[in-house]
Amino acid sequence: MHELSLCQSAVEIIQRQAEQHDVKRVTAVWLEIGALSCVEESAVRFSFEIVCHGTVAQGCDLHIVYKPAQAWCWDCSQVVEIHQHDAQCPICHGERLRVDTGDSLIVKSIEVE
């Protein structure tokens, strides 16, 4: 369950930002999850609640936004949207793709009190 370590990293980022800006309470967090990140929403929600306990983010609302993955096709030299790791290029059907975005979990926004 790598969702737990991803959420721990996210909460560390949130804590650092809260300390830098003298924030006492985080009320909402938006996480951006890439289509190829291999994380399950239910596991993220469960893990996030656990790692937020005792932090400025405890009890905050968690919003999850999904982001499609983008890859560079070496065969047709185009940036394309993909939805799985073993995808083919939707333009030329080539299989030589380099994933550029969409394989991460990012703290996109934090709402504070």
UniProtKB/Swiss-Prot annotation:
<keyword id="KW-0862">Zinc</keyword>
<dbReference type="InterPro" id="IPR000688">
    <property type="entry name" value="HypA/HybF"/>
</dbReference>
<dbReference type="GO" id="GO:0016151">
    <property type="term" value="F:nickel cation binding"/>
</dbReference>
<feature type="binding site">
    <location>
        <position position="92"/>
    </location>
    <ligand>
        <name>Zn(2+)</name>
    </ligand>
</feature>
<dbReference type="InterPro" id="IPR020538">
    <property type="entry name" value="Hydgase_Ni_incorp_HypA/HybF_CS"/>
</dbReference>
<dbReference type="GO" id="GO:0051604">
    <property type="term" value="P:protein maturation"/>
</dbReference>
<dbReference type="GO" id="GO:0036211">
    <property type="term" value="P:protein modification process"/>
</dbReference>
<comment type="function">
    <text>Involved in the maturation of [NiFe] hydrogenases. Required for nickel insertion into the metal center of the hydrogenase.</text>
</comment>
<dbReference type="GO" id="GO:0008270">
    <property type="term" value="F:zinc ion binding"/>
</dbReference>
<feature type="binding site">
    <location>
        <position position="73"/>
    </location>
    <ligand>
        <name>Zn(2+)</name>
    </ligand>
</feature>
<dbReference type="InterPro" id="IPR039002">
    <property type="entry name" value="HybF"/>
</dbReference>
<dbReference type="Pfam" id="PF01155">
    <property type="entry name" value="HypA"/>
</dbReference>
<keyword id="KW-0533">Nickel</keyword>
<comment type="similarity">
    <text>Belongs to the HypA/HybF family. HybF subfamily.</text>
</comment>
<keyword id="KW-0479">Metal-binding</keyword>
<feature type="binding site">
    <location>
        <position position="2"/>
    </location>
    <ligand>
        <name>Ni(2+)</name>
    </ligand>
</feature>
<protein>
    <recommendedName>
        <fullName>Hydrogenase maturation factor HybF</fullName>
    </recommendedName>
</protein>
<feature type="binding site">
    <location>
        <position position="3"/>
    </location>
    <ligand>
        <name>Ni(2+)</name>
    </ligand>
</feature>
<feature type="binding site">
    <location>
        <position position="76"/>
    </location>
    <ligand>
        <name>Zn(2+)</name>
    </ligand>
</feature>
<feature type="binding site">
    <location>
        <position position="89"/>
    </location>
    <ligand>
        <name>Zn(2+)</name>
    </ligand>
</feature>
